[in-house]
């Protein structure tokens, strides 16, 4: 569920992944403080152990997409909003490609790019996802029915489970789903699958 980080490379220059994980850690802590809840409270809400919550906030471990999904559920926020909450500067209308936050799941190799300009107050989020061959990620129910998403496949084949249903999607296919239904994504092919996720709230 998480990858333990080595402390032997402290002197090495911070990578883009390090920056993203710091944003996530800061975002979790800030959101938790905004809600006025303790690490124990978040652990109870999300089903993630109190020890793991603390390690993630201290950047001692690299959380997987599934684990982050559970934490975001406990915080009542999407991952994109979580990352944005760690940014103190006001939002800009343009998100340059080189400046868009990119996060890699240490468990699956999934690469998630937050395309939408952050901190603009928009109720729409646009995320680009690259799912490696022979990998999958599953998300628990997010108890907020007003969140939904449209998934548009750009390249490759994507298998999406949504509740009790399974959908095989190809390039150009689009599917709508809600966050209050368990869902997951799998790439059974031999090459990466790329897709866009449009989240509305």
Q: In which residue ranges do the predicted regions lie?
A:
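Recognition helix of helix-turn-helix/homeodomain-like DNA-binding domains
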Residues: 47-61
